[in-house]
């Protein structure tokens, strides 16, 4: 089962990716992890990626596609894989298609921007332990304090409203067009496309995914 997850940052993809991996026994392929592993391995592709990144440039789509092809040929991908964070653009999706990388399901996690802002901006973390709270959905017993140690909670830089809104604008400009792209692909019979209501409780979203994926 080959799956692509689409949705804005904060739409709940990460939580459900864990569930899909465990339930269907497929690995999650994150382009960031893949690039780091390739560089570490010192392979030909890894060396190319390192040179580009060392020069402060973005790795080309061709190189990422070559790495994806190499990665999905590995033994743990024989039953499928889960792509999160790739493709991000229509040229990347086209390049994937030209490389013969097919997918069975494209799942779109649909959550309104304002709810995403609410979800992310309300997060508070206890840096030392990694415990995460939410001022509205999962508040600490004492406002601003960690339940276990009583230490001060902080807001991650990535969770500040300005940053979140900027990431949402980038998502709508770059990645949202993929929704139309994969809807057409599904109409042509090349994949199956499903929209998942990401505003529901985690367990309800999980049940919806089980229904879609079987």
Swiss-Prot record:
Q: Provide this UniProt record's keywords sorted from A to Z.
A: ATP-binding, Cytoplasm, Kinase, Nucleotide biosynthesis, Nucleotide-binding, Transferase
Location of the region described as NMP in the Swiss-Prot/TrEMBL record:
30-59
Q: What class of enzyme is it?
A: transferase
Principal location class:
cytoplasm
Q: What is its EC number?
A: 2.7.4.3
Catalysed reactions, semicolon-separated: AMP + ATP = 2 ADP
Q: Which biological pathway?
A: Purine metabolism; AMP biosynthesis via salvage pathway; AMP from ADP: step 1/1
Question: Can you cite an annotated GO cellular component?
Answer: cytoplasm
Q: Which residues bind AMP?
A: 31, 36, 57-59, 85-88, 92, 156, 167
One of its GO biological process terms is: AMP salvage
Where does the record say this protein resides? Answer: Cytoplasm
Q: How does it assemble?
A: Monomer.
Give the family, as the similarity comment puts it.
Answer: Belongs to the adenylate kinase family.
- Domain note: Consists of three domains, a large central CORE domain and two small peripheral domains, NMPbind and LID, which undergo movements during catalysis. The LID domain closes over the site of phosphoryl transfer upon ATP binding. Assembling and dissambling the active center during each catalytic cycle provides an effective means to prevent ATP hydrolysis.
UniProt function note: Catalyzes the reversible transfer of the terminal phosphate group between ATP and AMP. Plays an important role in cellular energy homeostasis and in adenine nucleotide metabolism.
The record ties this protein, via PANTHER family, to: NUCLEOTIDE KINASE (PTHR23359)
- Supply the name of the protein: Adenylate kinase
Q: Which organism is it from?
A: Klebsiella pneumoniae subsp. pneumoniae (strain ATCC 700721 / MGH 78578)
């Amino acid at each position: 089962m080959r799956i692509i997850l689409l949705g804005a940052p904060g739409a709940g993809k990460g939580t459900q990716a864990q569930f899909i991996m465990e339930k269907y026994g497929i690995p999650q392929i994150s382009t960031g992890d893949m690039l780091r592993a390739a560089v570490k391995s010192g392979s030909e592709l890894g060396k190319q990626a390192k040179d580009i990144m060392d020069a402060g440039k973005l790795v080309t789509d061709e190189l990422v596609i070559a790495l994806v092809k190499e990665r999905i040929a590995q033994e743990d991908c024989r039953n499928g894989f889960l792509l999160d964070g790739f493709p991000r653009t229509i040229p990347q999706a086209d390049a994937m298609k030209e490389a013969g990388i097919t997918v069975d399901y494209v799942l779109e996690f649909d959550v309104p921007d304002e709810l995403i802002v609410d979800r992310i901006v309300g997060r508070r973390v206890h840096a030392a332990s990694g415990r995460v709270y939410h001022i509205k959905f999962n508040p600490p017993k004492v406002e601003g304090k960690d339940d276990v140690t009583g230490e001060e909670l902080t807001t991650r830089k990535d969770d500040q409203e300005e940053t979140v809104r900027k990431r949402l604008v980038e998502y709508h400009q770059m990645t949202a067009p993929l929704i139309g792209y994969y809807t057409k692909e599904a109409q042509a019979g090349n994949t199956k496309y499903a929209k998942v209501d990401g505003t529901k409780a985690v367990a309800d979203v999980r049940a919806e995914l089980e229904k879609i994926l079987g």
